[in-house]
Amino acid sequence: MKVSELMVTDVFTCNDTELLGDVARLMWEHDIGFVPVISSESGAVVGVITDRDGFLAAYFQGKMLWELPVRSAMSTRIASVSADAEVGEAESIMSEFQVHRLPVVAKDGKLVGVVSLNDFARKAAREANEKFEEEVAVTLGAICQPRTPETRAEA
């Protein structure tokens, strides 16, 4: 099965010059915790921001969310996948990078969607596919492993 069959294409995004307060409002209003960051120049994905990233950046910099640009908190080490990749490849990337969501990007780096572990779980539940359920469980187990200080620094 291809990532394109499970990914969500209606994705909220932001650019790196927006303020964390604006992105926090977007997350609150749409009940999301992950936003791809898009370059205003090229339209390519240049990072991702999570609710956790924003909170920790504001806390440790001693500033309000409205004082900080997204670029001060976004992750630039982007784990992504292509729409034509097999779901197993996406699961492997999620496991390796210990993430629940992946931007789905075209060859030019532009966002075409997002695929999440929840998408895999919903698919497994709909189809009652034991092999797929096992793959999802293994991926979740890998994602949930505690990070070492070294892997946290790489993220």
Question: Whereabouts are the PLM-identified features?
Answer:
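The conserved cystathionine-beta-synthase
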Residues: 13-31, 38, 81-98, 104-106, ...
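Tandem CBS (Bateman) regulatory domains
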Residues: 1-9, 50-82, 86-95, 116-155
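Glycine-/small-residue-rich active-site loops that bind phosphorylated ligands and cofactors
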Residues: 12, 42-43, 62, 79, ...
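A glycine-centered beta-loop-beta connector
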Residues: 27-29, 35-53, 94, 102-118
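Short hydrophobic/aromatic-rich motifs at helix boundaries and adjacent loops
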Residues: 6, 24-26, 41-43, 61-63
